[in-house]
């Protein structure tokens, strides 16, 4: 399974568990931050063709919409949680640089800024625009894209 960083394309910031713990509690918010360290590495665990779990490599917890609803409303926070179920399935869209939830909403920085400050929450939203693009890069070279479906 490939280990990677999730990089906000417009700002160059990275997805992190808030607080940077190697074993964050369930429902720990996911934020954007400029730091790079081993506690913000991710892996993608394919479950059904293109759908899978975005796994926090250090803890094994996975990315969820807060509350675990099948169709989370706009502005639902993204968190880490230990449970694995269909409501936590995402696809990594390399062609459009999006992360899409099984219900059809996308990962966004809260507020939709192209240059969000450190500690900006990440949320689910149905809009598509340049500020919600993410790329998947190597922990050894933050400018080198990696394939997560391997």
Curated annotation (Swiss-Prot):
Superkingdom assignment: Eukaryota
Binding site for D-galactose 3: 75, 108, 111, 127-129
Record-listed D-galactose 1 binding positions: 16, 19, 35-37, 119
Glycosylation (residues): 26, 74, 118
Metal-binding recorded as keyword: no
Record PTM text: Glycosylated.
Variation of activity with pH: Optimum hemagglutination activity at pH 7.4. Retains its hemagglutination activity throughout pH range 3-10. This protein is most stable at pH 7.4.
Thermal dependence, as annotated: Optimum hemagglutination activity between 37 and 40 degrees Celsius. Retains its hemagglutination activity up to 60 degrees Celsius, but loses the activity at higher temperatures. This protein is stable at high temperatures over 80 degrees Celsius. The thermal stability is increased by the presence of ligand D-galactose.
Activity modulation notes: Hemagglutination activity is not dependent on divalent cations. Hemagglutination activity is highly inhibited by D-galactose and N-acetyl-D-galactosamine, and to a lesser extent by raffinose. Also inhibited by melibiose and alpha-lactose, but not by beta-lactose or D-glucose.
Molecular functions per Gene Ontology: galactose binding
Keywords: Glycoprotein, Hemagglutinin, Lectin
Amino acids binding D-galactose 2: 27, 64, 67, 83-85
Role this protein plays: D-galactose-binding lectin. Also binds N-acetyl-D-galactosamine. Has hemagglutination activity towards all types of human erythrocytes (O, A and B) and rabbit erythrocytes. Agglutinates Gram-negative and Gram-positive bacteria including E.coli DH5-alpha and L.plantarum ATCC8014, respectively, and has bacteriostatic activity against them. Also agglutinates M.lysodeikticus. May be involved in innate immunity by recognizing and eliminating pathogens.
Complexes and interactors: Homodimer. Likely to form large oligomers; oligomerization enhances hemagglutination activity.
Protein name: Galactose-binding lectin
Species, as recorded: Mytilus californianus (California mussel)
């Amino acid at each position: 399974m490939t280990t990677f960083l999730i990089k906000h394309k417009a700002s160059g910031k990275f997805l992190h568990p808030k607080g940077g713990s190697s074993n964050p509690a369930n429902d720990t918010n996911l934020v954007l931050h400029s730091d790079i360290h081993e506690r913000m590495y991710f892996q993608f665990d394919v479950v059904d063709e293109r759908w899978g779990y975005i796994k926090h490599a250090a803890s094994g917890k996975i990315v969820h919409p807060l509350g675990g609803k099948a169709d989370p409303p706009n502005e639902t926070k993204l968190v880490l949680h230990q449970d694995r179920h269909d409501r936590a399935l995402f696809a990594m869209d390399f062609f459009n640089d999006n992360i899409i939830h099984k219900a059809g909403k996308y990962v966004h920085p809260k507020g939709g800024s192209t240059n969000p400050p450190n500690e900006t929450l990440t949320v689910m939203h149905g809009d598509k625009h340049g500020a919600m693009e993410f790329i998947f890069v190597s922990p050894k070279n933050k400018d080198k894209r990696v394939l997560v479906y391997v």
